[in-house]
From Swiss-Prot:
GO terms for molecular function: heptaprenylglyceryl phosphate synthase activity; magnesium ion binding. InterPro entries: GGGP/HepGP_synthase_I, GGGP/HepGP_synthase_sf, GGGP_HepGP_synthase. The gene is pcrB. This is Heptaprenylglyceryl phosphate synthase. It catalyses: sn-glycerol 1-phosphate + all-trans-heptaprenyl diphosphate = 3-heptaprenyl-sn-glycero-1-phosphate + diphosphate. The keyword Magnesium applies. The keyword Kinase does not apply.
Length: 225
């Protein structure tokens, strides 16, 4: 997967917009958000995407993001926080409650490093965002070599990140997939981050300028003579 759209169930998205996203050339979708999450909204958004054969990932930040019919679940582990609630606390409580029913083969964990101090997710998780490139690289190595996480996700959450930092991270990961998300608002920015990240995630621009969002997926289309 090279490109994913991230959709927030707390935000309104017309059916025709969803159809355009499905046929844009993207490789799939993440459904996830930070606040005002309700199970009905998650179900409605999942149903809107039902016409696609593309993978749909539910990013589980609380119980409202759990749909039994979903095929793919992402479990975020926030690495740059000292609040254990977001590294393993909530995870343990959900496992304690639902452990006998969890479809483990449909679950993928992702090591998050959140880098925009003004983002809701940074404030919620108490993320330490004032990091050097060396700090970020250390977290990448921690994710791959200590925790053996399949995904390392650098999240600037609404703010376009530093391509040089992203490049440096890409050079130290070999087995763990490198995902980048944050502030991609043009196909040029998408192409820049795609040079380094295995997968780019495009989110906010969907709700600001749908056509520009669609353009970010076109850079991966194979050219025909």
């Amino acid at each position: 997967m090279k490109h994913l759209f991230k959709l927030d169930p707390a935000k309104n998205l017309p059916r025709n917009s969803v159809t355009k996203l499905i046929h844009s050339g993207t490789d799939g979708f993440i459904i996830g958000g930070t606040d005002n999450l309700e199970i009905e909204a998650v179900e409605n958004l999942y149903e809107l995407l039902a016409e696609t054969d593309l993978p749909i990932f539910l990013e589980v930040s609380d119980e409202s993001m759990i749909l039994p019919e979903a095929e793919h679940f992402l479990i975020p582990v926030v690495l740059n926080t000292e609040n254990s609630k977001w590294t393993h606390g909530l995870h343990k409580e959900l496992i304690k409650e639902l452990g006998d029913f969890i479809p483990w083969k449909r679950i993928t964990s992702e090591g998050y490093v959140i880098l925009n101090k003004d983002a809701k997710v940074a404030q919620l998780t108490e993320a330490k965002t004032d990091l050097t490139d060396e700090d970020i690289i250390a977290y990448a190595r921690l994710a791959e070599n200590i925790f053996r996480l399949p995904i390392f996700y650098v999240e600037y959450s609404g703010m376009y990140g530093d391509p040089e930092a992203v490049r440096k991270v890409s050079e130290v990961l070999s087995d763990t997939e490198f995902w980048y998300g944050g502030g991609i608002r043009s196909k040029e920015q998408a192409a820049e981050m795609a040079k380094y990240a295995d997968t780019i995630i495009v989110g906010n621009i969907i709700y600001e300028d749908l056509e520009k969002a669609l353009e970010t997926a076109t850079i991966f289309r194979k050219k025909t003579v």
